[in-house]
Amino acid sequence: MLDIFIDADACPVKEETFRVALRYDLRVFLVANAPLRLPPQGRVELVVVPGSFDAADDWIAERIDQGDIAVTSDIPLAKRCLDKGARVVPPNGRQFTPANIGAALASRALMQDLREMARADGTALRGNAPFSAQDRSRFLQELDTVINAVRRGR
């Protein structure tokens, strides 16, 4: 069964995901560390996982399965989901795949090292680019594409 798991605490595309899931009549697990507002319609279940920093990630990784979709920008969580045969669509719409997750993990580690070095010598590094309307549009298109691919068994 195709379910969508949202790593929800900082996800900017929750409402968009709800609308797409409603159109396809899919169940959505909104996984967060604190209560969030749910849409009035659809098959959305809020899962509040208090505790450790990675509690939401662990809940998703333990339950996601082949053919499910994760909505997350968390690269280590994306890797865990891909390892279980799930598909991963981050909010920017640039899908994580088995072919590109290694490079994403390496880039993340490099940026983490650069931030630590910059902090040590007082240098400021720019953060990620702001979330844009183009990102939102690309996310909607990619989520739709992935849902249809999973339904066709691809």
From Swiss-Prot:
Pfam families: DUF188
Top-level lineage group: Bacteria
Record-linked CDD domains: PIN_YqxD-like
InterPro entries membership: UPF0178
Family: Belongs to the UPF0178 family.
HAMAP family attached to this UniProt entry: UPF0178
Name of the protein described by the UniProt record: UPF0178 protein RC1_2062
Organism field: Rhodospirillum centenum (strain ATCC 51521 / SW)
